Amino acid sequence: MKVGIIGLGIMGYRIAKNLAKDDILNYVYDRTPAKAMEFKKEFENVEYFNDPTELAKSSDVVITILSDDNAVTSIIKPLIPIASNKIIIDMSTISPITSYELAKEINSKGYFYDAPIIGTSIAVENKSIVILVGGPYEKFETVKEILTHTSNNIVYMGGNGFGLKGKLVNNLLIGVYMAALSEAFNFGLDLGLTKEQIGYILSKLSSARSPTSEIKIPKIINGDYSTQFSVKNIRKDLDIIINISQHYNSLVPLASLTENLYKITESLGYSSLDFSSIFEMYRKLTLK
């Protein structure tokens, strides 16, 4: 079975490394050729393609991990004529509606799965990410067998789009939580507490502490916003959530408010940095 990966961004590169280390990855493609060439230097047995469709022709299983709906659609649409008996696993976070429409076309010939990730780039390296899978159960065990090389927790959610629905539920909470965490931290500083005092309360003592607070509080204290999950991506996900909520007539006022806070954070130059940098938005806009 030949496996190819399309998309070598923050998450995709690390997933590809996990598969390559276990000798199950054959091909890679990225729209930035230098990334694919860099990967080839590290893993000589992996071939890189200059064209995603050519990669797909040579692969039995194609994994995509891309930035947004447009990127996924532009890659998947040309694969429809050659999808016969192929398994396509899209690990991007996009609209479930977009994913479902693509799945209908692919599933007429092959097998399409949405398989978004819960977890950071560090969790990918540790193989501790959660992968939520939506798609035909018929080939799920094959999909799971491949993904176990990069995750120890793979959950079948149901039909096409249901993996993404689960991911969006998670990201609504994560997006709002990070904003609330930053607001509380900023409030504590304004009250005269030290960063260390606030960090200890929020990450160790609070009943609202979580893996997110334990990971992100040190980043805030140290001003280290190296990207694990970017501001632009959480803002993009909240935008998807808001649009989907209208389709399902669901009330998401906190998602709407929080999306605007991340937009402000982007406008201040933090778009590509870790989404914990929303704390800097609070500091810059705090009135003294």
Where do the model's predicted regions map?
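Amphipathic alpha-helical hairpins
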Residues: 10, 61, 67, 71, ...
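Helical "substrate-binding/catalytic lid" subdomain
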Residues: 162-285
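Rossmann-like NAD(P)(H) cofactor-binding subdomain of soluble oxidoreductases
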Residues: 52-57, 61-63, 68-129
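Rossmann-fold dinucleotide-binding core
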Residues: 94-171
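NAD(P)+-binding Rossmann beta1-loop-alpha1 motif at the extreme N-terminus of oxidoreductases
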Residues: 1-64, 86, 121
